[in-house]
Swiss-Prot record:
GO terms for cellular component: endoplasmic reticulum membrane; ERMES complex. Component of the ERMES/MDM complex, which serves as a molecular tether to connect the endoplasmic reticulum (ER) and mitochondria. Components of this complex are involved in the control of mitochondrial shape and protein biogenesis, and function in nonvesicular lipid trafficking between the ER and mitochondria. MDM12 is required for the interaction of the ER-resident membrane protein MMM1 and the outer mitochondrial membrane-resident beta-barrel protein MDM10. This is Mitochondrial distribution and morphology protein 12. Belongs to the MDM12 family.
């Protein structure tokens, strides 16, 4: 079975590029800038003409998080507190029986996908890392929905990673786990699909419910081409046509992002000199596992984890975090500099593995400043953070396809 995606028709719609540009600009406007730059904005964006390579790895039912609403969350959180304070053994036994019955009903929902005959099993310690630090606050009110569980409690069973092989995975909040549960960054967790989405909840109930403050999910981005980005509550009931894809996406295309910012010289007085900088972000490299779910005329999208390319410089020990590949070369205006994510980020999903930046400082014919590496590294890291926080699990973005129906209803009411 195959799907044909008309990429040229998708990118020919300028409203889509404009919507993404406005979204990124709003995100950059919301971050705290260091003292040496100001007036940061996104001046241009283009998806480019090169489509990503998409390989479907699994087709099944959507994650339960896409169906949960705020009322259910409040009830579950109250139940979770009750469980943490101590519930009688009889009550716990009853709950376990109910969960076991549910697990049996879903035991055949997920198929086995084997890429390598060498099967490895690794123990997850997702809850330990998540409970150690508080969740990061949203960048803006445009924060999309967030799942209640750790990234793979929905697709891991019995606290083991099962049924997908031959992939180095960088799990959100987990890092790379070996058989003893330690973070090494080099061992290869090889499986991500499971048969028991509640295994982590049963063994560590406090890890399942996380921040679901509805005030964080306000806002909506409307597209002119018939859909809109929305932060509406997930569907509360399952439909017979609901479906979810787990896919591997590999992108190394000609996406272009243009940023403008002023570089400040604060000596001998604050803002003594202001130099305009134009940064062209190109050659974006992404290799990740994603989920795409269709629920009642809405499409949910989220990055689940990175795929670690064995032959890539992304996970070599010599690679430094967000540093130019050619450290000896002087970064002058108009030069291209590559930035790659290094081993320090192995504990989290990065999504952006590599990116190239061309800097223009002052007038194009003049070398106004010889070193803008600090500005470039700051912007690259912020771009990674924005995409990771907004699109990586446990966050997701929802494309609401009901806009045409809403417009028709409004027209009928006016007539």
């Amino acid at each position: 079975m195959s799907f044909d995606i008309n990429w040229s028709e998708l990118v020919s719609d300028e409203s889509l590029n404009e919507s993404i540009k406005e979204f990124l600009d709003n995100q950059f406007q919301s971050i705290s800038l260091p003292s040496f730059i100001d007036n940061l904005s996104v001046s241009d964006f283009s998806l480019g003409n090169s489509p990503p390579e998409i390989t479907i790895r699994h087709i099944g039912d959507p994650f339960d998080d896409f169906y949960e609403d705020e009322g259910d969350d409040d009830e579950k959180e109250r139940k979770n507190v009750y469980m943490q304070q101590g519930v009688s053994e009889d009550t716990n036994s009853s709950d376990d029986d109910e969960d076991d019955e549910y697990d049996g009903d879903r035991s055949n929902d997920l198929s086995i996908i084997t890429e390598d005959p060498n099967i490895h099993t690794f123990t997850s310690e997702a809850d330990r890392s998540r409970l150690a630090s508080p969740p990061r606050p949203p960048l803006t009110d445009l924060r999309r929905s967030r799942a209640s569980s750790d990234p793979f409690s929905l697709i891991m069973g019995n606290n083991n990673l099962n049924y997908m092989h031959n992939y180095n995975m960088n799990y959100v909040g987990l890092g790379n786990l070996n058989a003893t549960g330690t973070h090494t960054g080099t061992d290869t967790p090889t499986n991500i699909l499971n048969q028991n989405p509640y295994a982590t909840l049963k063994s560590n109930p406090s890890s399942y419910y996380k921040n679901k403050d509805p005030s964080k999910f306000s806002g909506s981005d409307t597209h002119k081409n018939g859909f809109r980005l929305t932060s509406k509550e997930p569907c509360s009931t399952r439909g017979e046509n609901d479906i979810q894809l787990i896919a591997e996406v590999k992108y190394n295309g000609d996406l272009h992002l243009e940023l403008t910012v002023n570089l400040l010289v604060n000596y001998p007085s604050p803002n003594f000199i202001s130099l305009p900088i134009k940064l062209h972000v190109t050659d974006l490299v992404i290799h990740s596992i994603i989920t795409i779910a269709y629920l009642k005329n809405s499409v949910f999208f989220s990055f689940l984890c990175d795929v670690n390319d064995i032959n890539s410089d992304y996970f070599t020990s010599s690679t430094q975090n967000s540093t130019p590949e050619h450290m000896g070369a002087t970064n002058t205006g108009g030069n291209f500099v590559d930035y790659v994510s290094g081993p320090i980020n192995r504990e989290r999903i990065d999504i952006i593995k590599k990116v190239k930046i061309e800097s223009e400082i002052g007038e194009a014919e003049q070398n106004a400043l010889r070193n803008v590496g600090k500005v470039e590294r700051f912007l690259v890291e912020q771009l990674r953070n924005i995409i990771r926080d907004e699109f990586a699990w446990p966050s997701w973005v929802c494309f609401d396809l009901n806009e045409d129906d809403d417009d028709e209803s409004d027209d009928q009411e006016e007539n």
